[in-house]
Amino acid sequence: MLHPLAIVFYERLMPGSQLVNRLQDLNYRVLAVNNPALLAATTKRETPLLLFVDLEARGDITGAIEKIRADAATSHLPVIAFAPDHKTEALAAAQKAGANLTVSESALAGHLQTLLDQALHLD
């Protein structure tokens, strides 16, 4: 049986590795990406079921989300962006760039299955 692929973009060990482990526990294959310049191309090449994007990484993360949205081959993929609880500006910028869901790290940790269900039922 082929397990669905999730791409997780992160630089920070926590919560990135924790998210990877939780997704693997839910039977996802996980591809970790740590360079925002490669995120759109990797997404197009690997065709994941969904993406998680850590907004606290260095580089143009919202630009990477915009590239994913602008490409017909990837524009339909759910993007869940997350940031520390106090980084509301980063969450708003990610939503404007096209992230389907924007959540705080505490919400991500506590409600992963619910977020997956919501992301995979978006139009």
Could you describe each region identified by the protein language model?
Residues 53-68:
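Conserved phosphotransfer microenvironments
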Residues 73-78:
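His-Asp phosphorelay/catalytic-motif detector in bacterial-type signaling
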Residues 35-50:
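Acidic, metal-coordinating helix/loop segments flanking the phosphotransfer/catalytic sites
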